[in-house]
Amino acid sequence: MRKTKIVCTLGPATDKEGVLREMMLSGMNVARFNFSHGTHSEHKVRLDAVKALREELDLPVAAMLDTKGPEVRLRNFKNGSVELAAGQAFTLTTEDVEGDETRCAITYPQLPQDVSAGDTILLDDGLVRLTVLETTATAIRCRVENSGVMKNHKGVNVPGVSLSMPYMSQQDKDDILFGVEQGFDFIAASFVRCAADVREIRRVLNAAHSRIRIIAKIENQEGVSNLREILAEADGVMVARGDMGVEIDFTEIPAIQKDMIAQCVACGKPVITATQMLDSMIENPRPTRAEITDVANAIYDGTSAIMLSGETAAGKYPVEAVKTMDAIARKTESNIDCSRGTVPPSRTHLSVTAATAHAACTTAADIGADAILTVSQGGITAQMVSRFRPEAKVVALLLDPQIRRQMALYWGLVPIMMERADSTDELVHSAIDTAEQAGLIKHGDLVVVTAGVPVGVSGTTNMIRIEQVGGALVNGTGIGDETASGPLCVCRTPEEVAGKFRPGDVLVVPYTNNELLPYMKEAAAVISEEISAEGHTATVGLLLHKPVIIGAVQATRRLQDGVTVSVDCSRGIVQIMPQ
Protein backbone atom coordinates (compact mmCIF):
# COMPACT_ATOMS: atom_id res chain seq x y z
CA MET A 1 0.00 0.00 0.00
CA ARG A 2 1.45 3.35 -1.08
CA LYS A 3 2.21 5.71 1.81
CA THR A 4 3.17 8.84 -0.17
CA LYS A 5 0.07 10.73 -1.34
CA ILE A 6 -0.62 12.14 -4.82
CA VAL A 7 -2.08 15.60 -5.47
CA CYS A 8 -3.49 16.18 -8.97
CA THR A 9 -4.42 19.52 -10.53
CA LEU A 10 -7.73 19.57 -12.40
CA GLY A 11 -8.24 21.39 -15.67
CA PRO A 12 -9.45 20.93 -19.25
CA ALA A 13 -7.65 17.59 -19.59
CA THR A 14 -9.58 16.12 -16.66
CA ASP A 15 -12.94 17.27 -18.03
CA LYS A 16 -12.89 14.55 -20.68
CA GLU A 17 -15.29 11.70 -20.02
CA GLY A 18 -13.90 9.02 -17.77
CA VAL A 19 -10.56 10.74 -17.10
CA LEU A 20 -11.31 11.90 -13.56
CA ARG A 21 -12.68 8.48 -12.61
CA GLU A 22 -9.54 6.76 -13.90
CA MET A 23 -7.32 9.25 -12.05
CA MET A 24 -9.12 8.48 -8.78
CA LEU A 25 -8.90 4.74 -9.35
CA SER A 26 -5.22 5.10 -10.26
CA GLY A 27 -4.30 6.71 -6.95
CA MET A 28 -5.23 10.41 -6.81
CA ASN A 29 -5.65 11.42 -3.15
CA VAL A 30 -6.21 15.18 -3.47
CA ALA A 31 -7.81 17.20 -6.28
CA ARG A 32 -6.20 20.63 -6.65
CA PHE A 33 -8.14 23.56 -8.12
CA ASN A 34 -5.91 26.39 -9.37
CA PHE A 35 -7.81 29.63 -8.78
CA SER A 36 -5.23 31.60 -10.76
CA HIS A 37 -7.26 30.36 -13.72
CA GLY A 38 -10.96 29.78 -14.32
CA THR A 39 -14.21 31.10 -12.89
CA HIS A 40 -16.18 30.04 -9.85
CA SER A 41 -18.74 28.33 -12.07
CA GLU A 42 -16.02 26.35 -13.87
CA HIS A 43 -14.48 25.24 -10.58
CA LYS A 44 -17.89 24.26 -9.20
CA VAL A 45 -18.58 21.98 -12.15
CA ARG A 46 -15.28 20.17 -11.54
CA LEU A 47 -15.80 20.03 -7.77
CA ASP A 48 -19.27 18.57 -8.22
CA ALA A 49 -17.74 15.89 -10.45
CA VAL A 50 -15.19 15.07 -7.73
CA LYS A 51 -17.93 14.89 -5.08
CA ALA A 52 -20.08 12.58 -7.18
CA LEU A 53 -17.22 10.21 -7.98
CA ARG A 54 -15.80 10.03 -4.47
CA GLU A 55 -19.28 9.19 -3.18
CA GLU A 56 -19.76 6.51 -5.84
CA LEU A 57 -16.30 5.00 -5.38
CA ASP A 58 -16.12 5.55 -1.59
CA LEU A 59 -12.74 7.22 -1.95
CA PRO A 60 -11.81 10.07 0.44
CA VAL A 61 -10.43 12.37 -2.26
CA ALA A 62 -9.86 15.81 -0.72
CA ALA A 63 -10.45 19.10 -2.55
CA MET A 64 -7.73 21.77 -2.39
CA LEU A 65 -8.32 25.40 -3.37
CA ASP A 66 -5.06 26.99 -4.53
CA THR A 67 -5.36 30.77 -4.19
CA LYS A 68 -4.16 33.30 -6.69
CA GLY A 69 -2.21 35.01 -3.92
CA PRO A 70 -0.25 38.26 -4.15
CA GLU A 71 1.09 37.32 -7.54
CA VAL A 72 1.65 39.32 -10.70
CA ARG A 73 0.54 37.85 -14.02
CA LEU A 74 0.31 38.86 -17.63
CA ARG A 75 -3.17 39.48 -18.95
CA ASN A 76 -4.29 38.35 -22.42
CA PHE A 77 -2.59 38.44 -25.79
CA LYS A 78 -4.70 39.16 -28.85
CA ASN A 79 -3.93 35.78 -30.40
CA GLY A 80 -3.34 33.89 -27.14
CA SER A 81 0.44 33.97 -27.40
CA VAL A 82 3.38 35.85 -28.94
CA GLU A 83 6.98 35.04 -29.72
CA LEU A 84 9.49 37.40 -28.13
CA ALA A 85 12.94 37.77 -29.67
CA ALA A 86 16.16 38.52 -27.82
CA GLY A 87 17.10 42.20 -28.03
CA GLN A 88 13.65 43.54 -28.84
CA ALA A 89 11.77 46.11 -26.76
CA PHE A 90 8.76 44.94 -24.77
CA THR A 91 6.51 46.95 -22.46
CA LEU A 92 4.53 45.82 -19.43
CA THR A 93 1.58 48.15 -18.88
CA THR A 94 -1.14 48.66 -16.30
CA GLU A 95 -3.52 49.84 -19.02
CA ASP A 96 -6.32 47.55 -20.16
CA VAL A 97 -5.00 46.55 -23.57
CA GLU A 98 -4.77 43.37 -25.62
CA GLY A 99 -1.22 42.11 -25.75
CA ASP A 100 0.91 41.78 -28.85
CA GLU A 101 4.62 41.52 -29.77
CA THR A 102 5.34 44.95 -28.28
CA ARG A 103 3.38 45.09 -25.03
CA CYS A 104 1.11 43.26 -22.59
CA ALA A 105 -1.07 44.29 -19.65
CA ILE A 106 -0.23 43.09 -16.11
CA THR A 107 -2.47 42.39 -13.11
CA TYR A 108 -0.64 44.53 -10.52
CA PRO A 109 -1.09 48.29 -11.09
CA GLN A 110 1.70 49.34 -8.68
CA LEU A 111 4.48 47.35 -10.34
CA PRO A 112 5.89 50.39 -12.24
CA GLN A 113 6.40 52.09 -8.86
CA ASP A 114 8.06 49.03 -7.27
CA VAL A 115 10.75 48.40 -9.91
CA SER A 116 13.65 50.49 -11.14
CA ALA A 117 15.89 50.65 -14.19
CA GLY A 118 18.30 47.72 -14.18
CA ASP A 119 15.97 45.33 -12.33
CA THR A 120 15.34 41.89 -13.81
CA ILE A 121 11.80 40.71 -14.57
CA LEU A 122 11.17 37.04 -15.31
CA LEU A 123 8.17 35.77 -17.25
CA ASP A 124 6.66 32.27 -17.07
CA ASP A 125 8.93 30.86 -14.33
CA GLY A 126 11.99 32.40 -15.97
CA LEU A 127 11.35 31.25 -19.54
CA VAL A 128 11.90 34.82 -20.75
CA ARG A 129 14.10 37.37 -18.95
CA LEU A 130 13.53 41.10 -19.25
CA THR A 131 15.75 43.97 -18.13
CA VAL A 132 13.98 47.15 -17.02
CA LEU A 133 15.09 50.18 -19.07
CA GLU A 134 12.74 52.83 -17.68
CA THR A 135 9.40 53.23 -15.95
CA THR A 136 6.46 55.62 -16.10
CA ALA A 137 3.34 55.84 -13.97
CA THR A 138 1.67 53.10 -16.01
CA ALA A 139 4.40 51.31 -17.97
CA ILE A 140 7.68 49.42 -17.62
CA ARG A 141 9.81 49.51 -20.76
CA CYS A 142 12.12 46.51 -21.02
CA ARG A 143 14.64 44.77 -23.21
CA VAL A 144 14.09 41.06 -23.97
CA GLU A 145 17.24 39.15 -23.01
CA ASN A 146 16.30 35.76 -24.47
CA SER A 147 13.77 34.50 -26.98
CA GLY A 148 10.66 32.56 -26.04
CA VAL A 149 6.94 32.08 -26.62
CA MET A 150 4.72 33.85 -24.09
CA LYS A 151 1.08 32.90 -23.45
CA ASN A 152 -1.89 34.37 -21.60
CA HIS A 153 -1.82 34.64 -17.79
CA LYS A 154 1.81 33.61 -17.32
CA GLY A 155 3.53 34.62 -14.09
CA VAL A 156 5.67 37.72 -13.61
CA ASN A 157 8.48 37.59 -11.03
CA VAL A 158 10.84 40.32 -9.89
CA PRO A 159 13.69 38.59 -7.97
CA GLY A 160 15.10 40.59 -5.08
CA VAL A 161 12.37 43.24 -5.18
CA SER A 162 9.88 43.51 -2.31
CA LEU A 163 6.48 44.33 -3.77
CA SER A 164 4.18 46.67 -1.89
CA MET A 165 0.99 44.73 -2.62
CA PRO A 166 -1.11 43.50 0.37
CA TYR A 167 -1.11 39.77 1.06
CA MET A 168 -4.82 39.07 0.63
CA SER A 169 -6.72 40.67 -2.21
CA GLN A 170 -10.49 40.92 -2.37
CA GLN A 171 -10.38 38.28 -5.09
CA ASP A 172 -8.59 35.86 -2.75
CA LYS A 173 -11.10 36.53 0.01
CA ASP A 174 -14.00 35.92 -2.37
CA ASP A 175 -12.36 32.70 -3.56
CA ILE A 176 -11.81 31.47 0.00
CA LEU A 177 -15.42 32.17 0.97
CA PHE A 178 -16.51 30.35 -2.18
CA GLY A 179 -14.36 27.44 -1.02
CA VAL A 180 -16.06 27.45 2.39
CA GLU A 181 -19.49 27.50 0.78
CA GLN A 182 -18.64 24.63 -1.57
CA GLY A 183 -17.00 22.41 1.03
CA PHE A 184 -13.33 22.48 0.09
CA ASP A 185 -11.00 20.67 2.50
CA PHE A 186 -7.74 22.60 2.06
CA ILE A 187 -6.62 26.10 1.12
CA ALA A 188 -3.22 26.17 -0.58
CA ALA A 189 -2.17 29.72 0.28
CA SER A 190 0.10 31.11 -2.43
CA PHE A 191 3.22 33.18 -1.76
CA VAL A 192 3.14 32.91 2.03
CA ARG A 193 5.92 35.13 3.37
CA CYS A 194 5.40 34.98 7.14
CA ALA A 195 3.11 33.66 9.87
CA ALA A 196 0.96 36.80 9.65
CA ASP A 197 -0.10 35.81 6.12
CA VAL A 198 -1.41 32.47 7.41
CA ARG A 199 -3.20 34.18 10.30
CA GLU A 200 -4.91 36.53 7.85
CA ILE A 201 -6.43 33.58 6.01
CA ARG A 202 -7.26 31.83 9.29
CA ARG A 203 -9.27 34.86 10.43
CA VAL A 204 -11.39 34.67 7.28
CA LEU A 205 -11.98 30.95 7.81
CA ASN A 206 -12.76 31.34 11.51
CA ALA A 207 -15.25 34.10 10.79
CA ALA A 208 -16.98 31.72 8.39
CA HIS A 209 -16.89 28.90 11.02
CA SER A 210 -14.87 26.74 8.65
CA ARG A 211 -12.53 23.84 9.46
CA ILE A 212 -10.65 24.08 6.16
CA ARG A 213 -6.93 23.42 6.70
CA ILE A 214 -4.26 25.77 5.39
CA ILE A 215 -1.28 24.60 3.34
CA ALA A 216 1.30 27.40 3.11
CA LYS A 217 3.00 27.57 -0.29
CA ILE A 218 6.62 28.64 0.13
CA GLU A 219 7.72 30.39 -3.05
CA ASN A 220 10.33 33.02 -2.21
CA GLN A 221 13.29 33.74 0.06
CA GLU A 222 11.16 35.49 2.66
CA GLY A 223 8.98 32.40 3.05
CA VAL A 224 12.02 30.12 3.27
CA SER A 225 13.62 32.32 5.92
CA ASN A 226 10.42 32.37 7.99
CA LEU A 227 9.57 28.68 7.61
CA ARG A 228 9.71 27.88 11.33
CA GLU A 229 7.16 30.56 12.27
CA ILE A 230 5.00 29.65 9.27
CA LEU A 231 4.94 25.98 10.34
CA ALA A 232 3.70 27.03 13.76
CA GLU A 233 0.61 28.61 12.16
CA ALA A 234 -0.08 26.53 9.03
CA ASP A 235 -1.48 22.99 8.85
CA GLY A 236 1.11 22.02 6.25
CA VAL A 237 3.50 23.31 3.61
CA MET A 238 3.99 23.08 -0.14
CA VAL A 239 7.49 23.26 -1.61
CA ALA A 240 6.38 25.34 -4.60
CA ARG A 241 9.48 25.00 -6.74
CA GLY A 242 8.18 26.94 -9.74
CA ASP A 243 8.23 30.48 -8.43
CA MET A 244 10.84 29.51 -5.84
CA GLY A 245 13.26 28.63 -8.62
CA VAL A 246 12.71 32.04 -10.13
CA GLU A 247 12.78 34.10 -6.94
CA ILE A 248 15.81 32.25 -5.49
CA ASP A 249 19.04 31.06 -7.10
CA PHE A 250 17.96 27.77 -8.69
CA THR A 251 21.10 25.99 -7.48
CA GLU A 252 19.83 26.38 -3.91
CA ILE A 253 16.47 24.67 -4.54
CA PRO A 254 17.55 21.04 -3.82
CA ALA A 255 18.99 21.95 -0.41
CA ILE A 256 15.97 24.12 0.43
CA GLN A 257 13.63 21.28 -0.54
CA LYS A 258 15.43 18.79 1.69
CA ASP A 259 15.48 21.18 4.64
CA MET A 260 11.80 22.08 4.28
CA ILE A 261 10.76 18.42 4.13
CA ALA A 262 12.90 17.59 7.18
CA GLN A 263 11.39 20.43 9.22
CA CYS A 264 7.84 19.41 8.29
CA VAL A 265 8.41 15.74 9.14
CA ALA A 266 9.98 16.68 12.48
CA CYS A 267 6.93 18.67 13.57
CA GLY A 268 4.33 16.33 12.08
CA LYS A 269 3.00 18.67 9.39
CA PRO A 270 2.30 17.35 5.87
CA VAL A 271 4.58 18.60 3.10
CA ILE A 272 3.80 18.56 -0.63
CA THR A 273 6.63 18.62 -3.16
CA ALA A 274 5.40 20.33 -6.31
CA THR A 275 6.19 21.67 -9.79
CA GLN A 276 7.59 19.97 -12.88
CA MET A 277 7.78 16.55 -11.26
CA LEU A 278 6.72 14.78 -14.48
CA ASP A 279 6.66 17.85 -16.71
CA SER A 280 7.60 16.01 -19.91
CA MET A 281 4.40 13.94 -19.60
CA ILE A 282 2.40 16.99 -20.62
CA GLU A 283 3.44 15.98 -24.14
CA ASN A 284 4.93 12.48 -23.80
CA PRO A 285 3.49 9.19 -22.50
CA ARG A 286 6.61 8.39 -20.45
CA PRO A 287 8.70 10.50 -18.05
CA THR A 288 12.38 11.27 -18.37
CA ARG A 289 14.89 9.44 -16.19
CA ALA A 290 15.64 12.71 -14.44
CA GLU A 291 11.96 13.15 -13.53
CA ILE A 292 11.73 9.62 -12.16
CA THR A 293 14.75 10.32 -9.99
CA ASP A 294 13.33 13.67 -8.87
CA VAL A 295 10.09 12.06 -7.67
CA ALA A 296 11.97 9.24 -5.96
CA ASN A 297 14.37 11.58 -4.19
CA ALA A 298 11.49 13.63 -2.77
CA ILE A 299 10.06 10.39 -1.37
CA TYR A 300 13.45 9.35 0.04
CA ASP A 301 13.61 12.79 1.70
CA GLY A 302 10.28 12.05 3.39
CA THR A 303 7.75 14.17 1.50
CA SER A 304 4.14 13.48 2.49
CA ALA A 305 2.82 14.07 -1.01
CA ILE A 306 3.94 14.61 -4.59
CA MET A 307 2.03 16.89 -6.93
CA LEU A 308 1.08 16.96 -10.60
CA SER A 309 0.24 20.33 -12.16
CA GLY A 310 0.11 20.78 -15.93
CA GLU A 311 0.62 17.05 -16.36
CA THR A 312 -3.00 16.40 -15.32
CA ALA A 313 -4.60 19.82 -15.81
CA ALA A 314 -3.65 20.32 -19.45
CA GLY A 315 -1.49 17.38 -20.50
CA LYS A 316 -2.11 14.72 -23.10
CA TYR A 317 -1.66 11.85 -20.64
CA PRO A 318 -3.29 12.74 -17.28
CA VAL A 319 -4.19 9.18 -16.26
CA GLU A 320 -0.78 7.85 -17.29
CA ALA A 321 0.87 10.60 -15.23
CA VAL A 322 -1.01 9.48 -12.10
CA LYS A 323 -0.18 5.83 -12.73
CA THR A 324 3.47 6.76 -13.24
CA MET A 325 3.56 8.68 -9.96
CA ASP A 326 1.95 5.75 -8.19
CA ALA A 327 4.43 3.25 -9.65
CA ILE A 328 7.48 5.37 -8.79
CA ALA A 329 6.22 5.91 -5.24
CA ARG A 330 5.52 2.23 -4.61
CA LYS A 331 8.89 1.12 -5.93
CA THR A 332 10.76 3.82 -4.01
CA GLU A 333 8.96 3.04 -0.75
CA SER A 334 9.84 -0.64 -1.12
CA ASN A 335 13.50 0.40 -0.90
CA ILE A 336 13.07 2.44 2.29
CA ASP A 337 13.82 0.70 5.59
CA CYS A 338 10.95 1.57 7.92
CA SER A 339 11.56 -1.35 10.26
CA ARG A 340 12.13 1.02 13.17
CA GLY A 341 10.24 3.60 11.24
CA THR A 342 9.76 6.29 13.80
CA VAL A 343 11.18 9.75 13.52
CA PRO A 344 12.64 10.76 16.91
CA PRO A 345 10.55 13.36 18.72
CA SER A 346 11.74 16.87 18.01
CA ARG A 347 11.64 17.87 21.67
CA THR A 348 12.15 16.17 24.99
CA HIS A 349 8.59 16.44 26.30
CA LEU A 350 5.65 15.40 24.13
CA SER A 351 1.94 15.90 24.65
CA VAL A 352 0.03 12.86 25.92
CA THR A 353 -1.44 12.34 22.45
CA ALA A 354 1.95 12.54 20.72
CA ALA A 355 3.58 10.27 23.29
CA THR A 356 0.80 7.71 22.93
CA ALA A 357 1.11 7.83 19.13
CA HIS A 358 4.89 7.39 19.37
CA ALA A 359 4.45 4.45 21.73
CA ALA A 360 1.92 2.87 19.37
CA CYS A 361 4.45 3.04 16.54
CA THR A 362 7.31 1.55 18.55
CA THR A 363 5.02 -1.14 19.97
CA ALA A 364 3.89 -2.07 16.46
CA ALA A 365 7.53 -2.37 15.39
CA ASP A 366 8.48 -4.43 18.45
CA ILE A 367 5.72 -7.03 17.99
CA GLY A 368 5.63 -7.01 14.20
CA ALA A 369 2.04 -5.78 14.09
CA ASP A 370 0.18 -5.96 10.80
CA ALA A 371 -1.54 -2.61 11.34
CA ILE A 372 -2.04 0.33 13.67
CA LEU A 373 -5.68 1.34 14.14
CA THR A 374 -6.03 4.90 15.37
CA VAL A 375 -9.49 6.01 16.44
CA SER A 376 -9.55 9.78 16.25
CA GLN A 377 -12.25 12.38 16.86
CA GLY A 378 -10.49 15.30 15.19
CA GLY A 379 -7.70 13.52 13.34
CA ILE A 380 -4.95 14.65 15.71
CA THR A 381 -3.97 11.15 16.82
CA ALA A 382 -3.84 9.94 13.23
CA GLN A 383 -1.62 12.90 12.34
CA MET A 384 0.75 12.08 15.20
CA VAL A 385 1.02 8.44 14.14
CA SER A 386 1.74 9.60 10.59
CA ARG A 387 4.45 11.87 11.99
CA PHE A 388 6.42 8.93 13.37
CA ARG A 389 6.42 7.07 10.02
CA PRO A 390 5.73 3.48 11.13
CA GLU A 391 6.30 0.52 8.84
CA ALA A 392 2.91 -0.98 9.71
CA LYS A 393 -0.20 0.02 7.81
CA VAL A 394 -1.99 2.88 9.59
CA VAL A 395 -5.79 2.85 9.48
CA ALA A 396 -7.33 6.11 10.69
CA LEU A 397 -10.89 5.50 11.91
CA LEU A 398 -12.86 8.74 11.91
CA LEU A 399 -16.33 10.04 12.64
CA ASP A 400 -16.40 13.08 10.33
CA PRO A 401 -16.33 12.86 6.50
CA GLN A 402 -14.37 16.09 6.06
CA ILE A 403 -11.68 15.01 8.52
CA ARG A 404 -11.51 11.69 6.70
CA ARG A 405 -10.80 13.54 3.45
CA GLN A 406 -8.23 15.80 5.12
CA MET A 407 -6.39 12.76 6.48
CA ALA A 408 -6.01 11.58 2.86
CA LEU A 409 -3.10 14.04 2.50
CA TYR A 410 -1.12 12.66 5.45
CA TRP A 411 1.72 10.21 4.88
CA GLY A 412 0.78 6.58 5.37
CA LEU A 413 -2.80 7.10 6.57
CA VAL A 414 -5.70 5.04 5.21
CA PRO A 415 -8.74 6.99 6.45
CA ILE A 416 -12.12 5.25 6.82
CA MET A 417 -15.37 6.06 8.61
CA MET A 418 -16.63 4.23 11.69
CA GLU A 419 -19.67 4.40 13.94
CA ARG A 420 -19.52 6.19 17.28
CA ALA A 421 -18.95 3.91 20.30
CA ASP A 422 -20.03 4.39 23.92
CA SER A 423 -17.35 2.42 25.73
CA THR A 424 -13.69 1.58 25.31
CA ASP A 425 -14.31 -2.11 24.61
CA GLU A 426 -17.05 -1.30 22.12
CA LEU A 427 -14.77 1.23 20.42
CA VAL A 428 -11.89 -1.24 20.06
CA HIS A 429 -14.09 -4.02 18.70
CA SER A 430 -15.90 -1.63 16.36
CA ALA A 431 -12.58 -0.32 15.04
CA ILE A 432 -11.33 -3.84 14.33
CA ASP A 433 -14.62 -4.91 12.72
CA THR A 434 -14.74 -1.78 10.54
CA ALA A 435 -11.16 -2.16 9.34
CA GLU A 436 -11.70 -5.88 8.66
CA GLN A 437 -14.89 -5.23 6.68
CA ALA A 438 -12.99 -2.65 4.62
CA GLY A 439 -10.45 -5.32 3.71
CA LEU A 440 -7.60 -3.49 5.43
CA ILE A 441 -6.92 -6.20 8.01
CA LYS A 442 -7.80 -9.89 8.06
CA HIS A 443 -8.57 -12.67 10.47
CA GLY A 444 -5.49 -13.47 12.52
CA ASP A 445 -3.73 -10.14 12.05
CA LEU A 446 -2.06 -8.59 15.07
CA VAL A 447 -3.03 -4.93 15.46
CA VAL A 448 -2.19 -2.05 17.78
CA VAL A 449 -5.24 0.05 18.64
CA THR A 450 -4.87 3.56 19.99
CA ALA A 451 -7.75 5.74 21.13
CA GLY A 452 -8.86 8.08 23.89
CA VAL A 453 -10.57 7.63 27.21
CA PRO A 454 -13.17 8.98 27.82
CA VAL A 455 -14.55 7.94 24.45
CA GLY A 456 -15.49 10.66 21.96
CA VAL A 457 -13.58 13.54 23.52
CA SER A 458 -11.14 15.16 21.09
CA GLY A 459 -7.52 15.41 22.19
CA THR A 460 -7.68 12.72 24.89
CA THR A 461 -5.76 9.90 23.20
CA ASN A 462 -4.13 7.97 26.02
CA MET A 463 -4.76 4.26 25.41
CA ILE A 464 -2.92 1.51 23.54
CA ARG A 465 -4.17 -2.06 23.18
CA ILE A 466 -2.75 -5.01 21.30
CA GLU A 467 -5.48 -7.13 19.74
CA GLN A 468 -5.75 -10.17 17.52
CA VAL A 469 -8.27 -9.88 14.69
CA GLY A 470 -10.82 -12.60 15.34
CA GLY A 471 -9.56 -12.95 18.90
CA ALA A 472 -7.28 -15.60 20.37
CA LEU A 473 -8.92 -18.60 22.04
CA VAL A 474 -5.95 -18.92 24.40
CA ASN A 475 -2.57 -17.28 24.81
CA GLY A 476 0.69 -18.70 26.05
CA THR A 477 4.39 -18.90 25.33
CA GLY A 478 5.34 -20.33 21.97
CA ILE A 479 8.33 -22.62 21.67
CA GLY A 480 10.01 -21.80 18.36
CA ASP A 481 8.34 -19.86 15.58
CA GLU A 482 6.42 -22.56 13.71
CA THR A 483 2.72 -22.61 12.90
CA ALA A 484 0.31 -25.51 12.53
CA SER A 485 -3.39 -26.21 12.23
CA GLY A 486 -5.79 -29.04 12.95
CA PRO A 487 -8.80 -30.13 15.01
CA LEU A 488 -8.54 -29.83 18.77
CA CYS A 489 -8.23 -32.92 20.93
CA VAL A 490 -8.80 -31.71 24.50
CA CYS A 491 -7.80 -34.23 27.18
CA ARG A 492 -7.32 -33.99 30.93
CA THR A 493 -5.72 -37.40 31.51
CA PRO A 494 -3.39 -39.76 29.62
CA GLU A 495 -6.23 -42.29 29.46
CA GLU A 496 -8.42 -39.76 27.68
CA VAL A 497 -5.62 -39.11 25.17
CA ALA A 498 -5.30 -42.83 24.44
CA GLY A 499 -9.03 -43.11 23.91
CA LYS A 500 -9.71 -40.31 21.42
CA PHE A 501 -6.49 -38.85 19.94
CA ARG A 502 -6.04 -39.16 16.16
CA PRO A 503 -2.87 -38.30 14.19
CA GLY A 504 -2.94 -34.68 13.01
CA ASP A 505 -4.94 -33.45 16.00
CA VAL A 506 -3.82 -30.44 18.03
CA LEU A 507 -3.30 -32.06 21.42
CA VAL A 508 -4.43 -29.99 24.44
CA VAL A 509 -3.40 -31.27 27.89
CA PRO A 510 -2.65 -29.95 31.41
CA TYR A 511 0.92 -31.32 31.16
CA THR A 512 2.92 -33.94 29.26
CA ASN A 513 5.16 -36.84 30.23
CA ASN A 514 6.87 -39.77 28.53
CA GLU A 515 3.59 -41.70 28.51
CA LEU A 516 2.24 -39.12 26.02
CA LEU A 517 5.37 -39.06 23.85
CA PRO A 518 3.96 -41.31 21.05
CA TYR A 519 0.92 -39.03 20.72
CA MET A 520 3.03 -35.88 20.76
CA LYS A 521 5.04 -37.22 17.82
CA GLU A 522 1.86 -37.61 15.73
CA ALA A 523 0.18 -34.38 16.85
CA ALA A 524 0.02 -31.34 14.55
CA ALA A 525 0.85 -29.25 17.62
CA VAL A 526 0.77 -29.46 21.40
CA ILE A 527 -0.85 -26.98 23.79
CA SER A 528 -0.03 -27.40 27.46
CA GLU A 529 -1.02 -25.59 30.64
CA GLU A 530 2.47 -26.39 31.96
CA ILE A 531 4.36 -23.13 32.58
CA SER A 532 8.04 -24.06 32.72
CA ALA A 533 10.12 -23.40 29.62
CA GLU A 534 12.44 -26.16 30.85
CA GLY A 535 9.64 -28.66 31.43
CA HIS A 536 8.74 -31.81 29.50
CA THR A 537 6.45 -30.16 26.92
CA ALA A 538 8.93 -27.46 25.91
CA THR A 539 11.87 -29.86 25.81
CA VAL A 540 10.10 -32.47 23.67
CA GLY A 541 8.75 -29.76 21.39
CA LEU A 542 12.26 -28.53 20.67
CA LEU A 543 13.60 -32.06 20.11
CA LEU A 544 10.76 -33.00 17.76
CA HIS A 545 10.63 -29.58 16.04
CA LYS A 546 6.97 -29.64 16.96
CA PRO A 547 4.83 -26.46 17.32
CA VAL A 548 4.26 -26.12 21.06
CA ILE A 549 2.57 -23.52 23.26
CA ILE A 550 3.10 -23.72 27.02
CA GLY A 551 1.54 -21.70 29.82
CA ALA A 552 -1.86 -21.76 28.09
CA VAL A 553 -3.90 -21.00 31.20
CA GLN A 554 -7.11 -23.09 31.51
CA ALA A 555 -6.66 -24.34 27.95
CA THR A 556 -8.37 -27.65 28.77
CA ARG A 557 -11.44 -25.73 29.99
CA ARG A 558 -11.55 -22.97 27.38
CA LEU A 559 -10.92 -25.07 24.27
CA GLN A 560 -13.48 -27.39 22.72
CA ASP A 561 -12.96 -30.77 21.05
CA GLY A 562 -13.16 -30.88 17.26
CA VAL A 563 -12.79 -27.15 16.59
CA THR A 564 -10.22 -26.53 13.86
CA VAL A 565 -7.63 -24.03 15.03
CA SER A 566 -4.35 -22.46 13.98
CA VAL A 567 -1.42 -22.50 16.40
CA ASP A 568 1.07 -19.65 16.00
CA CYS A 569 4.14 -20.22 18.15
CA SER A 570 5.79 -16.92 17.17
CA ARG A 571 2.88 -15.09 18.80
CA GLY A 572 1.89 -17.68 21.37
CA ILE A 573 -1.75 -17.76 20.31
CA VAL A 574 -4.42 -20.25 19.30
CA GLN A 575 -7.19 -19.08 16.98
CA ILE A 576 -10.19 -20.54 15.23
CA MET A 577 -9.39 -21.09 11.57
CA PRO A 578 -11.43 -18.75 9.34
CA GLN A 579 -14.07 -20.54 7.29
Segments from the language model and where they lie:
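Acidic, glycine-rich flexible loop/linker segments
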Residues: P70-S169, K173, T434-A435, L440-E495, ...
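Short beta-alpha connecting loops at secondary-structure transitions
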Residues: M244-V246, M277-E291, S304-K316, G341-S346, ...
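Structural preference for beta-strand elements that scaffold enzyme active sites
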Residues: K5-V7, V30-R32, P60-M64, A89, ...
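Expand to "…catalyze enediolate/carbanion chemistry for C-C bond making/breaking, isomerization
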Residues: M1-P12, K16-E17, M24, T39-K44, ...
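Conserved alpha/beta-domain cores
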Residues: C8-P12, E42, V161, P166-T275, ...
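C-terminal helical cap(s) of enzyme catalytic domains, especially alpha/beta-barrels
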Residues: K44-V50, R202, T312-N335, R465-E467
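Protease-associated
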Residues: L350-H358, T362-A364, I466-Y519
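Feature captures the catalytic cores and cofactor-binding loops of soluble hydro-lyases/lyases
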Residues: G38, E42, R46, A392-E426, ...
